[in-house]
Each structure stands twice: as C-alpha cells, then as structure tokens.
Swiss-Prot record:
Function recorded in the entry: Involved in protection against oxidative stresses. May play a significant role in maintaining the cellular homeostasis during stress and virulence of M.tuberculosis. In vitro, catalyzes the decomposition of cumene hydroperoxide (CHP) to acetophenone.
Phenotypic consequence of gene deletion: Disruption mutant is sensitive to oxidative stress and exposure to toxic transition metals. In a human monocyte (THP-1) cell infection model, mutant shows reduced uptake and intracellular survival and increased expression of pro-inflammatory molecules, including IL-1 beta, IP-10, and MIP-1 alpha. In a guinea pig model of pulmonary infection, mutant displays growth attenuation in the lungs. Knockdown of the gene leads to increased sensitivity to peroxides such as cumene hydroperoxide and hydrogen peroxide.
Organism classification: Bacteria, Bacillati, Actinomycetota, Actinomycetes, Mycobacteriales
Regulation of this protein's activity per its record: Interaction with PknI increases the peroxidase activity by several folds.
UniProt keywords, alphabetically: Oxidoreductase, Peroxidase, Virulence
Pfam family, one: CMD
Note: Though the Rv2159c protein is a peroxidase, it does not form disulfide bridges between the two catalytic site cysteines.
Source domain of life: Bacteria
Family that this chain belongs to: Belongs to the AhpD family.
Organism: Mycobacterium tuberculosis (strain ATCC 25618 / H37Rv)
Protein name: Alkyl hydroperoxide reductase Rv2159c
Assigned EC number: 1.11.1.-
Consequence the record notes for mutating residue 84 to S: Loss of activity
C-alpha cells in the first residue's frame, strides 16, 4: 500500500472477515480507507479494536466532529507528526473551521475569538501533566480524553510506519490540496453516526484502572478495554521487554528524550543481547518516535519477524505511552470536577 513502510497492510481486494468489515465501515463513514487504520491490518484483532477506539472517540458522540478534529490536530502538532496534521487540518477545512486549521498549520494559537481556541490549547498541552485545565465538563470528558489518548497513540505509529505526508508538491500545492480535500469530505464530516456500532464485534473486557476516565461512555470504555486487552495479551514482546518499557514510561512525565537515541542503552543493558533491539524500538516508539530509524526496525525483525508481530509491538509501545498520558489528563479533569463540586 502506498505511503506505508516496513509492513504490508492487507489490500482491500484481498480482505476478508473482520478486516473486510472494518474496511467497509471506514470507507462508508470516513469516505476512504485511512492509511493509519489500514496499517493495523496485519493483526486483525488490533485492527478491529483500533477501529473501535478511533470511531467511538472521533466520529460519534455529543461533541461536534470539527471540535474533535481540532483536538486531534493539536495533539498531532505537539508530536510534530506532519501526516497527522495534514489529515486533521483537511478535516477542519471540511468542517468549515478554516481559521483553526490555518492557525495549527502556522504553528500559532487560534485567535481568542475562535471557539476551538481553549480546546486546541488544552490538547496541545496534554503531553505533560502541567498542561492547561480542561475546558469541558464531565458529561463529555470521555470523548475529549478519548480523542486525545487515541491520537497520542496513533500519531506515534504514524511517525514510525508512514511517509511524512500524503500530500504532493510544495507548501502552496499542499495547501490547495487540503482545501480541495475539505470540499470532498465536507458531507462525511457533517454526517451523524450511531455510537457503539464498531464495538459489536468486540468481546467484553475489563477496563483497566488507568483507563477509568473512559467509564462514563460505554462505547469508548468497551473499545479501549478491548484494545488494552489485545495489546497486553499479544505474544510479540517478551515479559522482560515489557517490564523495562513499563518502568521507563511509568516514570516519564512528558519530558523530551535526549537528542541522541543512546538514552535507550542504559535501559537495555540489563537485558539479554537478543532483546536489546526490540526493547530499544519499543522505548523509542513510545517516548521518541522521531528517533526511530530504518535500522532500528530492521534490527528488531530478528524477534518481530512477521508484520503482525512488528505492528503489534509498535502499537503496544505507542499505547503504553498514550495510556500514561491518559492518567494525568484524566486525573486533572476529574480533579477539576471535584473542585467545582466539593462535598461536605
């Protein structure tokens, strides 16, 4: 598939079973099959759960689609993911929110009068516990928190597996393409969809405590519980690698990693030599996806020797970091509610 590196997604013409169902749903509701979704297809369980978290956060619910695209675009910009920024700003044009799109593309804050401004500021700051307060109430918190966590997850995978952008040409041509894409997808962005449709093929799973922020929305909670269970039980990464990554991510507070990727060496040194490369790749994917090189991926292939194993390992690492972010933005949002509604 064009634009995808290191793996071969399932081609639409060869898709069957749940993969074909997800592809059809995505085309119907997005207007096309997005590469960041197709890249999950070597692992059918990951694709079905990943589609559910994507759909139930971004495409349905009380919060307007355009507002969620602004949140997703701001998260993408904070991670310096050009593909993601191009995709979400195109959808902002489709939603008619051109000022928000222009500000994010320019790397500036939206104007004070832009209704999306506080949401963009919040989303841009979700990468650290010191971000601005949430500008939303508890009735829609799961939608906003889920959108932010979803795109902290997906953007990390995109940075490793996809080209820098899908737009051809230079800046002027790319801007024209974004606006043209906005016209193409305008009807899809404004369409309303019924919550929960993507979760019907998922088995019920227990929602982990660190994802408790999703509880108020049954479809979002079901989707994230399924994704968490699938990634945590997949066999692709051995327990010693998972233990190291969980420990390092668990002590991370959003600070940028050193510019040299040698920071991983102190964490892999304790492991057997054959686990150094996959552990390094997992650490980089979660905490410094820009530092992942083709050589890093190739070196990890000795253990991650299938496309399903590679995408599953990368997804687990990316989701581990996104879950960590979810703990602090979820706690901050809950704390705001507690302060606004004191008891006693």
């Amino acid at each position: 598939m064009k634009f995808v590196n290191h793996i071969e997604p399932v081609a639409p013409r060869r898709a069957g079973g749940a993969v074909a169902e997800v592809y059809a749903e995505a085309r119907r509701e997005f207007g096309r099959l997005p590469e960041p979704l197709a890249m999950l297809s070597p692992d059918e369980g990951l694709l079905t759960a990943g589609w559910a978290t994507l759909r139930e956060t971004l495409l349905v619910g009380q919060v307007p689609r355009g507002r969620k695209e602004a949140v997703a675009a701001a998260v993408a910009a904070s991670l310096r993911c050009p593909w993601c920024v191009d995709a979400h700003t195109t959808m902002l044009y489709a939603a008619g929110q051109t000022d928000t799109a222009a500000a994010i593309l320019a790397g500036t804050a939206p104007a004070a009068g832009d209704p999306n401004a506080p949401y963009v500021a919040w989303a841009a700051g979700t990468g650290t516990p010191a971000g601005p307060p949430a500008p939303f109430g508890p009735d829609v918190a799961a939608e906003y928190l889920g959108t932010a966590v979803q795109f902290h997850f997906i953007a990390r995978l995109v940075l490793v597996l996809l080209d820098e952008t899908f737009l051809p040409g230079g800046p002027r041509a790319q801007q024209l393409m974004r606006r043209a894409g906005g016209l193409v997808f305008a009807r899809k962005v404004r369409a309303e969809h019924r919550p929960g449709r993507s979760t019907r093929r998922l088995e019920p799973r227990t929602l982990p405590d660190d994802l408790a922020w999703a509880t108020p929305s049954e479809p979002i909670a079901t989707a994230f519980a399924a994704l968490s269970h699938h990634l945590d039980t997949a066999p692709h990464l051995p327990p010693p690698t998972r233990q190291v990554v969980r420990r390092v991510v668990g002590s991370w507070h959003g600070e940028p990693m050193p510019m040299s990727s040698r920071w991983t060496n102190e964490h892999t040194a304790e492991l057997p030599a054959d686990l150094h490369a996959p552990t390094r790749l997992a650490l980089l994917t979660g905490l410094a996806p820009h530092q992942v090189t083709d050589d890093d991926v190739a070196a990890a292939r000795s253990l991650l020797d299938t496309d399903a194993a590679l995408v599953g390992a990368l997804a687990w690492a990316a989701f581990t970091a996104a879950r960590r972010i979810g703990t602090w933005i979820g706690a901050a949002a809950e704390g705001q509610v507690s302060r606004q509604n004191p008891t006693g």
